[in-house]
C-alpha cells in the first residue's frame, strides 16, 4: 500500500471516529453538548479541523461548500470560541494515536539505517497565542524594551521518524518545563505502541544525563546523545572509548557501560557522542553520519 492510500485510510478512520457518538462521548466535557444546541460537538470538531489563518467567514464558507450535509449554522466567533472549550483535549490525542497506529501497521516496509529504524527527539521554546486561558495556564511574560507588551511561551517537543518522515508524538508544556521530562513522555509512547524495537533514538545536547541514559538502557532503547564539551565524559574521551557509569547501593543502581566517541567536524571542532550501541562495526564515521540524520 502506498502512502497516498495510507493517508486516505487515516482520514477515513478519523471521519468514522468523530461521527461515532459512542466514541466521542468520553471527550465531551460533562454537562455540555447534551441538549439540542445550535452547535453540535461534531460541528465544532469539524470547524477546528478546517480552521486556518483565513477569516472565520472563509473557514465556514469552505465547510459549507465541502460538507453541505453538515448544515453548519450561522454563529459568532465568540460562540465558536466558547464551544471549543468544552471538547476534552484527549480527543486529539486519541486521533493522533489512531493515525500513528494506522501508518505503521499499513506501511509496506520501513526505511533502515544499517538495519535500524531512526527516531530523533527535539524541543523548542515557542511563543503561543495570547488569550486569557493561555496566560492562566502557561503564565504571562513581558520583555525589554517594551515592558507593556504581554505574551506567553511554552516548550514544544516531538519525536520524529527521520527516515519515514513521520511525527509519532508531540507535546506542549509550560515554558520552564524540562526537555528531558518531555522526552521521557515520548519514549513511553514508543513503548506503549511497540515501535521502539530495533530502533536508535538520537538526542541533541541538553538531553544527556546519567538518569536519562540509564532509562534508555533499562527500557531497551538504543540511543545516541550528544554531550556538552565541558562534562567529564567528553574531557576524558580521545577517539572511541568505553566508560562506566558507576552504580550506587544508596540509589539502587548498578554499573552501566557507556560508549563515548570524539567526532571531528569539518570546521575543525569536535563533538562528543554517548551511546549504548557497542557494535564495533558501527564506526566513528558512521556515528557522525547517524547523528547528522537528526537535522
Features from the language model and the residues they span:
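Single, function-defining residue in the core of a domain
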Residues: 1-60, 74, 79, 84-87, ...
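Charge-biased, low-complexity intrinsically disordered regions
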Residues: 48, 66-69
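Short Pro/Gly-enriched beta-strand edge/turn motifs at strand-loop
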Residues: 137-143
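Residues within the helices of the helix-turn-helix
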Residues: 61, 65
Amino acid at each position: 500500500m502506498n502512502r497516498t492510500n495510507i493517508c486516505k485510510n487515516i482520514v477515513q478512520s478519523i471521519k468514522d471516529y468523530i461521527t461515532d457518538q459512542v466514541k466521542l462521548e468520553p471527550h465531551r466535557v460533562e454537562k455540555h453538548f447534551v441538549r439540542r444546541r445550535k452547535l453540535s460537538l461534531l460541528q465544532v470538531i469539524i470547524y477546528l479541523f478546517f480552521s486556518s489563518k483565513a477569516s472565520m467567514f472563509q473557514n465556514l464558507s469552505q465547510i459549507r461548500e465541502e460538507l453541505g450535509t453538515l448544515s453548519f449554522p450561522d454563529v459568532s466567533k465568540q460562540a465558536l470560541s466558547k464551544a471549543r472549550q468544552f471538547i476534552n483535549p484527549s480527543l486529539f490525542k486519541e486521533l493522533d494515536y489512531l493515525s500513528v497506529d494506522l501508518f505503521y501497521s499499513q506501511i509496506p516496509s520501513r526505511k533502515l539505517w544499517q538495519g535500524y529504524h531512526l527516531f530523533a527527539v527535539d524541543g523548542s521554546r515557542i511563543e503561543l497565542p495570547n488569550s486569557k486561558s493561555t496566560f492562566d495556564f502557561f503564565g504571562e511574560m513581558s520583555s525589554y524594551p517594551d515592558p507593556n507588551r504581554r505574551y506567553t511561551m511554552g516548550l514544544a517537543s516531538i519525536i520524529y521518524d527521520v527516515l519515514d518522515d513521520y511525527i509519532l508524538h508531540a507535546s506542549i508544556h509550560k515554558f520552564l518545563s524540562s526537555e528531558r521530562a518531555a522526552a521521557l513522555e515520548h519514549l513511553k509512547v514508543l513503548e506503549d505502541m511497540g515501535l521502539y524495537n530495533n530502533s536508535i533514538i538520537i538526542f541533541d545536547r541538553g538531553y544527556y544525563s546519567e538518569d536519562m541514559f540509564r532509562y534508555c538502557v533499562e527500557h531497551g532503547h538504543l540511543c545516541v546523545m550528544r554531550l556538552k564539551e565541558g562534562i567529564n565524559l567528553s574531557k576524558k574521551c580521545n577517539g572511541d572509548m568505553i566508560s562506566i557509569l558507576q552504580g550506587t547501593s544508596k540509589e539502587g543502581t548498578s554499573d552501566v557501560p557507556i560508549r563515548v566517541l570524539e567526532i571531528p567536524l569539518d570546521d575543525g571542532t569536535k563533538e562528543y557522542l554517548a551511546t549504548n550501541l557497542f557494535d564495533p562495526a558501527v564506526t566513528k564515521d558512521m556515528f557522525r553520519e547517524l547523528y547528522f540524520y537528526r537535522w
